[in-house]
Amino acid sequence: MLQGDWSSDVCSSDLEEIIMKMWKKAASVMLASAMVVSLAACGSSGNSGKSDSGSSDADTFKIGGIGPTTGDAAIYGTAVKNGIQLAVDEINAAGGINGKQIEYKFEDDQADSEKSVNAYNTLKDWGMQALIGTTTSTPCTAVVEETHSDNMFQLTPSATAVDSIQYDNAFRMCFSDPNQGSASADYIAENKLATKVAIIYNSSDTYSSGIYQTFATEAKAKGLDVVAAEAFTADNKTDFSVQIQKAKDAGAELVFLPIYYQEASLILAQANKAGFTPKWFGCDGMDGILDLDGFDASLAEDLMFLTPFTANATDEATQKFVADYKEAFGDTPIQFAADAYDCVYVIKAAAEKEDVTPDKSVSDICDALKKGMTEITYDGLTGKSITWSEDGEPTKEPTVVVVKSGEYQVLQAEDAAE
């Protein structure tokens, strides 16, 4: 019966019955196999609300970074990327964190919130266990929603907006917008730089408007006369003739610029053409103005701004960092590079304080680093005896630099009012 014509031995109805039984048996086997696979998958899934990366055989820490390496803000993201790389290389050469090496990966977000979230997801898929980033405030505010949901530790080197570290898993290395605004007003008043002050700010930018608000409040409290407060937006940031003229007509002795250096360079050039020569004072977004292509650096002479770092500082740590950075990347580091460099060493200090190892889950690493951050005191490039509160804010002293002969120099209090 195994050979020959089935029709000669089996009637049509019997043949159909045999075929149906065979199909049912095959289907049962396939269904059972599928259930085994499904149950195995369910057994291996973790808590969807928390990131569960990390395994018992993990032997390296995976640290990710996010910032703009292309686009208008590329100077900031590139500096952050390089600063992290320099610190990672040093730490790995010295034995790593708790004896474990660091793997490092950086993603470009073009200072865009949606791209920043995509970059975060890319790094998470890579296996990131802690994030240094993001570099700018608005993307950071978007990404912190993701890191909070995943209980991923996040330390931003340079995002200053209050909401960019609004959850307990997030910390910052830099000053916040409110801190920069109040510290700037205090410095101007206490060093008698001016009594009549104008402000030109970007009302469409979180960083700029945040600093403006606290500066205006603190300036009034310190007895400064804010004679003009002129806004511009992202859609109108090339012609500042109206804002400059209003500040000039109001008799401003000093103009406060809580903005980024790109717009500041245009304001300085246009004010010079208008014959308006007040004192100029900015914040950390001003760092990089001397490196802007096509900008006449002489227009920034005597420009002052608040920053935690200057490459011309004479202490040994800064001089070594600057020399190593120049050798590695061919540029002089700006504050963003120093902030990022410090971030890696801060994570190392917190991890060693809590004996963190890379075989732990992302969530466990985050919880340990959160605890460690509030217990360490850190001496770095961007401040001495830095401590952190549970809400992620650092406590450190600001530095004011001034542009002299095309270089940044630390401004001493006795020289400020000259």
Where do the PLM segments sit?
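Extracytosolic ligand-binding ectodomains
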Residues: 21-25, 43-418
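Bacterial Sec-dependent N-terminal signal peptides
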Residues: 13-29
